[in-house]
UniProtKB/Swiss-Prot annotation:
Its cofactor is Zn(2+). NCBIfam families: Q_tRNA_tgt, tgt_general. InterPro entries: ArchSynthase1/Queuine_TRR, TGT, TGT-like_sf, tRNA_ribo_trans-like. This is Queuine tRNA-ribosyltransferase. It comes from Shewanella amazonensis (strain ATCC BAA-1098 / SB2B). Binds 1 zinc ion per subunit. PANTHER family: QUEUINE TRNA-RIBOSYLTRANSFERASE. Pathway: tRNA modification; tRNA-queuosine biosynthesis. It catalyses: 7-aminomethyl-7-carbaguanine + guanosine(34) in tRNA = 7-aminomethyl-7-carbaguanosine(34) in tRNA + guanine. One of its GO terms (molecular function) is tRNA-guanosine(34) queuine transglycosylase activity. Zn(2+) binds at residues 302, 304, 307, 333. Residues 245-251, 269-273 are annotated as: RNA binding. Keywords: Glycosyltransferase, Metal-binding, Queuosine biosynthesis, Transferase, tRNA processing, Zinc.
Amino acid sequence: MKFELITTQGRARRGRLVFERGTVETPAFMPVGTYGTVKGMTPEEVRATGADILLGNTFHLWLRPGEEIMRKHGDLHDFMNWQRPILTDSGGFQVFSLGDIRKITEEGVHFRSPINGEKIFMDAEKSMQIQHSLGSDVVMIFDECTPYPATHDEARKSMQMSLRWAKRSRDEFDRLENPNSLFGIIQGSVYEDLRDESLKGLLEIGFDGYAVGGLAVGEPKEDMHRVLEHVCPQIPADKPRYLMGVGKPEDLVEGVRRGVDMFDCVMPTRNARNGHLFTSEGVIKIRNARHRDDTSPLDPKCDCYTCTNYSRAYLHHLDRCNEILGARLNTIHNLRYYQRLMEGLRGAIETGTLDAFVADFYTSQGREVPELKD
């Protein structure tokens, strides 16, 4: 992987990730394909929304279908017929989410399979091995996602263990002679001194890119913004910066303003299946009765397949009838909305008009622009 920094405006960055399987324009949003599919979508449909790269889930793909079946197909690209870049998370967040059915130790995580209750163990080495078999273009280190809230001492212990796991991840990645890229994950909860310690340790190990983890786990937005404002300027300018698991459209805008290059989130796809659709004027809840006889498109400013072919009334009808097509059309639109937002941000950075773009984004939704600290 090669990262090219094309231009900047303030802290915002316009760049490009170059992989053997294709180029990713940044800032970029990665649709989430947890089980090797973006729910309800073919790879061709996902690509048509403007996506350059997808995210796959190491934990779930390890449980089903498993490494053996993956190897028989070649790798995840061949298995799901997506011949462009794929980033896989390490499985740490999913294990963290298991709650009472998992036990975290220095060695790794013991847990019971959420599928059949089988006892399973995952550690840094196993995570690297699984991601190697998936053929991931970007591999994420195995880490512990620090819960929120956490005391300073709790966050420190969690962060320091993640640093030790980061070194083990790096060593195993190198032992496997994996030709792809490995990203470190900065932890430390909402504590700036712990974020500093985490980043310093990761830089000493050395990675191809750096993610900010442990955010969007319940902390106030002000804390997320503060952490990004503190951490992003310290990440080497020639390395991509990835904000994990974020988020709402305004979170992407605020992340870009603070120097983030990559994002992922289930929100556009999950919300689509629940009838919550993102538009240039805010969120539309398509199952509300007021859309029953509305012949207008979902978003007149959107060029997606859904908006150019169907009315709000039709989408309302499909949603009320629980038709699969409704979820698919909603997903196409939401993913295209996110990609159009990223395209707009990239163009604004290139032309030096980011401030105006951000102001228009918030004004169209009747909101004020959040403060950006120097």
